[in-house]
Regions:
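Generic protein-terminus/edge-of-domain signal
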Residues: 1-65, 80, 103-110
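A general structural signal marking secondary-structure boundaries and capping sites
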Residues: 11, 25-28, 48, 70, ...
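Residues that scaffold the ATP/ADP-binding catalytic core of kinase and kinase-like folds
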Residues: 52, 98-100, 204, 216
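Ligand-binding loop in jelly-roll beta-barrel domains
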Residues: 57, 71-95
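Amphipathic alpha-helical segments enriched in hydrophobic/aromatic residues interleaved with Lys/Arg
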Residues: 98-164, 175
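N-terminal positioning helix adjacent to the helix-turn-helix/winged-helix DNA-binding module
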Residues: 115-118, 165-173, 209, 218-221
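Basic/polar phosphate-binding segments, predominantly the helix-turn-helix DNA-binding elements
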Residues: 151, 176-178, 183-221
Length: 221
């Protein structure tokens, strides 16, 4: 377990500044009924957990990440106690809510398979810089911006290309449809074989194929 909360002073005039960073090993059950006062980026290093926000539950697995704006109630917890490790940072800045929204982070964002070596590398640079009481604040400010931009790029790339999990999920479903289109195929069957809920399957399928699963099936016939 390692965390740092820098003493906030002159860095408050910067557009981005670090208000806290750490590695939770293990991560515990956290309930924030009123959210945080800072912006938050949080990724899973190992183990598994769940995030609950806005009435929905999101799986937190290695490579997954979420962004949370200030003031949003949320909860997260490990699936197995003492076996979940996360890397988190919280940051602030004047007009940051508008800036984050302009970059596509509107309140809450989540995705799987977005954490890459660049993101983890910058995170550990920030963790090191945050320990420097003399020059760490400005260095961290630059790294926070670089970190956000790399996270944004990873989120956009995952959305564009679907992420490996979405690709493999659709590949299984499409192969099944092509082999069995002559018989009755249900949405429940496609979702079950893909290992996801009907709602998630439909959303990913429509995002990638630009049509609903049953519409695609009808066209194959």
């Amino acid at each position: 377990m390692e965390w740092i909360y820098p003493i906030l002073g002159k860095q408050k005039c910067l557009p981005f500044y670090l208000s806290g960073i750490g590695i939770a090993e293990p991560e515990y059950h956290v309930i924030r009924e009123e959210g945080l006062v800072s912006h938050q980026l949080h990724y899973t290093q190992s183990g598994r957990g769940n995030l609950v926000v806005g009435g929905a539950t999101y799986p937190l697995e290695p490579g997954s990440m979420f962004y949370m704006a200030p003031g949003i109630p949320h909860e997260y917890y490990p699936l197995v106690e003492d076996e979940w490790t996360t890397c988190w940072l919280v940051f602030r800045g004047e007009h940051l809510l508008e800036l984050m929204k302009g970059m596509g982070f509107d309140g809450f964002a989540y995705d799987k398979n977005v954490v890459n070596e660049k993101i983890t590398g910058i995170f550990h640079q920030m963790l090191k810089a945050a320990k420097d009481p003399l020059y760490g604040d400005e260095r961290c400010s630059m790294l926070v911006y670089e970190y956000i931009m790399n996270v944004r790029q990873a989120f956009l790339a995952n959305k564009k290309y679907g992420g490996q999990s979405a690709k493999s999920m659709l590949q299984r479903a499409l192969m099944f449809i092509h082999k069995n289109y002559a018989r009755d195929i249900t949405l429940e069957e496609l979702a079950e074989m893909s290992g996801v809920t009907k709602q998630h399957f439909c959303r990913v399928f429509k995002e990638q194929m630009r049509m609903r699963p049953m519409e695609y099936l009808a066209r194959q016939r």
